[in-house]
Amino acid sequence: MADEINTSAAASTGAEGEAPAAKKSKRKGKKNILNGVVHIQSTFNNTIITITDVSGNVISWSSAGARGFKGSRKSTPFAAQVAAGDAAAKAMEHGLKNVSVFVKGPGAGRESALRALAAAGLKINLIRDVTPIPHNGCRQPKRRRV
């Protein structure tokens, strides 16, 4: 009886010692998309660029933080330019050529992100500002006194 317990304990420890089977990651194939939509969300702290097809399915995205900028450097126009160039390069791998651009937010990276998209080789058909403007909704944060 003691032998049975030891063999079952040895069998269970042997199963634990083995590494679990590695999951095979399935690489997504290249889509063939010609027209897309670029959403630029530019806040005071970061700039996020998302590129979708006309249905709203995300093709690629990038942000200043994802490109390695930290802290106050994320809110600079140069960080927005790098993020936009990265997102455009990823999207152009899927065949994207023509884009409509929707810009949201008051941040510093709005114009530089637009210029980076054009410099990457995307043809910009439309630029629209979709910044939400309240009809006197929530109270604004108090002004900073430095």
Curated annotation (Swiss-Prot):
Record has Membrane as a keyword: no
Keywords annotated in UniProt: Ribonucleoprotein, Ribosomal protein, RNA-binding, rRNA-binding
SUPFAM superfamilies: Translational machinery components
GO MF annotations, alphabetized: rRNA binding; structural constituent of ribosome
Region ranges (Disordered): 1-28
GO biological process, one term: translation
Compositional bias annotation for Low complexity: 7-22
Pfam families named among the record's database cross-references: Ribosomal_S11
Function per UniProt: Located on the platform of the 30S subunit, it bridges several disparate RNA helices of the 16S rRNA. Forms part of the Shine-Dalgarno cleft in the 70S ribosome.
Subunit structure: Part of the 30S ribosomal subunit. Interacts with proteins S7 and S18. Binds to IF-3.
Family designation: Belongs to the universal ribosomal protein uS11 family.
Protein name as catalogued: Small ribosomal subunit protein uS11
Name of the encoding gene: rpsK
